[in-house]
Amino acid sequence: MYLFDMDGTLIDSNDVWKDVDREFLARRGLPYTKAYYEGVAHTIFPLAAKFTKEFCNLPDSEEDIMAEWMELAKDAYAHVTVKPGVRAFLKQCKAENRRMALVTSSVPVHCRTAMEKLGLMKYFESVTFAQELGIEKKDKRLWLGVAERYGVEPETCTLFDDSL
């Protein structure tokens, strides 16, 4: 089974979050740093908000931080593009009857917006949202759970991801 990440792997969206982070921090007079990026990149929303609150010593609640991020990113996902070669590869895999699923740290509404707009959902059996499970992609329990969900041995899965 082929498992695909979305942001940065299938679609060109990583700059969306850099732009959101820069704007969020600028509103508070804070710099966008490598240390900040490393703390929030490729993690699930609630953990990124917790990190942001603590790292930046903000009075905002984690819920308010996430709501502001959602507002800043809402239109961006309607304008992302497919990474070069992705559509042809997915089409080839589908023609070869390969099983494919999406596993993402992206927020569900952003994922659905982008994937539906780009016509990519038709290639995947389903989507697993790390955020809904409360498990980061770097945690092997996520991948073991995904394999179990699809009734396949983990050793038979191939992962396409830009961050692991």
Predicted regions located by residue number:
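Hydrophobic "anchor" residues on beta-strands that sit immediately upstream
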Residues: 1, 101, 157-158
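N-terminal helical cap/lid subdomain that shapes the substrate entry/recognition surface
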Residues: 1-87, 91-96
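Conserved G/P- and acidic residue-centered "switch" motifs that form tight phosphate/ATP-binding loops
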Residues: 5, 9, 104, 162
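Acidic donor-binding loop at a coil-to-helix junction in glycosyltransferase catalytic cores
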Residues: 17, 161-162
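Structural motif
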Residues: 40, 103-105, 160
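Short, acidic loop-to-helix structural element flanking the phosphoryl-transfer center
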Residues: 75-102, 108-112, 137-140, 144
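Substrate-recognition "cap/lid" segment bordering the active-site pocket of phosphatases
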Residues: 79, 107-158, 164
